[in-house]
């Protein structure tokens, strides 16, 4: 997210006369912006945690070529097809990978990488992002876009996940359960229990099957247990209800 924002912010449209336009960007400017943003965010985290000791910083990236969720739901993120990344995105990402400790696993998104690392370093980590989906990962989450902190328990993370399955995500192009928004999702979970059956019942009421509910759950679920991904075989264990 930070690389995308930094690369996007330095783009400049140039008119060469008449109808000829091109888009230009200076990767060095984007890299400077990236470092400034990272420095500011790290300072906020350390101040909030009242911590002055050593720490590690890991940048997570999505696999740019494959995404296991598209094997589960072919239309996943289909609304982004044809949308170009910022002109210097690739150069800035490579620059970050050359200078920072970075993680990117085949077929996974950056969110999954964070979730797996969160499990590995449980109790000694802070998840930093501007993505609301991180509320489905147990642990300490700093939303730098809104300057908000969350301490999310396993129970709360599971509730947030079940709600997300029903709500869906227009940005990622999975629809969830028709007619259910955030308020309704919270109400049905409070009324009928924070269990998979509650989700299935809502899908069935909408004329959908448990299989369709499971499909939505598998794309909504952010990997957050190390056993969910085999780093040697690059194999994902898809989410299943308990």
Q: PLM features: residue spans?
A:
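Short loop/turn segments at strand-loop or loop-helix junctions that form parts
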Residues: 1-8, 58-65, 70-72, 181
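Non-catalytic, usually N-terminal nucleic-acid engagement modules in DNA/RNA processing proteins
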Residues: 1-58
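Conserved phosphate/metal-binding and DNA-contacting active-site motifs used
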Residues: 44, 51, 57, 66, ...
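Short secondary-structure boundary/capping segments
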Residues: 9-13, 73-77, 142-144
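Extended two-metal-dependent nuclease catalytic cores across DNA- and RNA-processing enzymes
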Residues: 18-21, 52-54, 78-241
């Amino acid at each position: 997210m930070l690389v995308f924002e930094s690369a996007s912010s330095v783009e400049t449209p140039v008119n060469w006369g008449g109808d000829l336009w091109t888009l230009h960007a200076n990767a060095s400017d984007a890299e400077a912006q990236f470092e400034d943003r990272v420095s500011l965010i790290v300072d906020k985290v350390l101040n909030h945690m009242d911590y002055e000791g050593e720490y590690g910083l890991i940048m997570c990236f999505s696999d740019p070529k494959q995404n296991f969720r598209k094997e589960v739901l072919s239309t996943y993120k289909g609304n982004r097809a044809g949308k170009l990344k910022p002109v210097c995105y690739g150069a800035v990402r490579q620059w970050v990978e050359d200078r920072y400790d970075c993680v990117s696993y085949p077929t996974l998104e950056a969110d999954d990488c964070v979730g797996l690392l969160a499990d590995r370093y449980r109790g000694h980590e802070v998840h930093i992002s501007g993505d609301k989906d991180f509320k489905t990962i147990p642990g300490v989450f700093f939303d730098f876009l809104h300057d908000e902190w969350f301490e999310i328990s396993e129970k709360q993370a599971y509730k947030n996940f079940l709600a997300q399955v029903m709500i869906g995500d227009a940005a990622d192009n999975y629809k969830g359960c028709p007619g259910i928004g955030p308020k309704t999702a919270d109400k049905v979970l409070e009324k009928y229990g924070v269990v998979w059956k509650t989700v299935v019942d809502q899908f069935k009421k909408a004329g959908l099957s448990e299989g369709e509910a499971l499909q939505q759950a598998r794309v909504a679920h952010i990997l957050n247990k190390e056993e969910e991904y085999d780093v040697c075989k690059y194999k994902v264990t898809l989410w299943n209800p308990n």
